Amino acid sequence: MILIIYAHPYPHHSHANKRMFEQARTLEGVEIRSLYQLYPDFNIDIAAEQEALSRADLIVWQHPMQWYSIPPLLKLWIDKVFSHGWAYGHGGTALHGKHLLWAVTTGGGESHFEIGAHPGFDVLSQPLQATAIYCGLNWLPPFAMHCTFICDDETLEGQARHYKQRLLEWQEAHHG
């Protein structure tokens, strides 16, 4: 099962993530948990989230980039749900062997993320990748949709279909 942890603080204003969301939900074997809809008060049901994660083979963190990072509710979700003794530490093996895909949208172009002495978008994924590895998850190459503020509808829709295709290819490779 693919579990998408959807973390868009302003989903009604989304045009790129919304299209990705709509494409992904047409696939069989996909569960989407919209964090800002489930937890507008930021009071996360840790047991429910861990139960959803336990059913997943692929976990997707889908969100818009905010200040070169993840939205605050997703950060809190990771802090609370990936708990010691469950996700890491002594006895913390619940996520071992599962896969993690970071699916992110940005307003800027790919070259916008060439920062300092470490050019490239991959630098921004390092904290997430380190978290994944620390918890025994298999990190997959990220899916990034850039320039979403200036893309026309046709381009956005094409990128959203590419995202769906990426999920479908993962399903086919891992479940035949």
UniProtKB/Swiss-Prot annotation:
It is a peripheral membrane protein. Its main location: membrane. GO terms for molecular function: electron transfer activity; FMN binding; NADH:ubiquinone reductase (non-electrogenic) activity; NADPH dehydrogenase (quinone) activity. It catalyses: a quinone + NADH + H(+) = a quinol + NAD(+); a quinone + NADPH + H(+) = a quinol + NADP(+). The keyword Cell inner membrane applies. It is found in: Cell inner membrane. FMN binds at residues 8, 14-17, 65-68, 105-108. One of its GO terms (biological process) is potassium ion transport. Keywords: Cell inner membrane, Cell membrane, Flavoprotein, FMN, Membrane, NAD, Oxidoreductase. It comes from the Bacteria. Signal peptide: none annotated. HAMAP family: K_H_efflux_KefF (MF_01414). Homodimer. Interacts with KefC. Regulatory subunit of a potassium efflux system that confers protection against electrophiles. Required for full activity of KefC. Shows redox enzymatic activity, but this enzymatic activity is not required for activation of KefC. Belongs to the NAD(P)H dehydrogenase (quinone) family. KefF subfamily. This is Glutathione-regulated potassium-efflux system ancillary protein KefF.
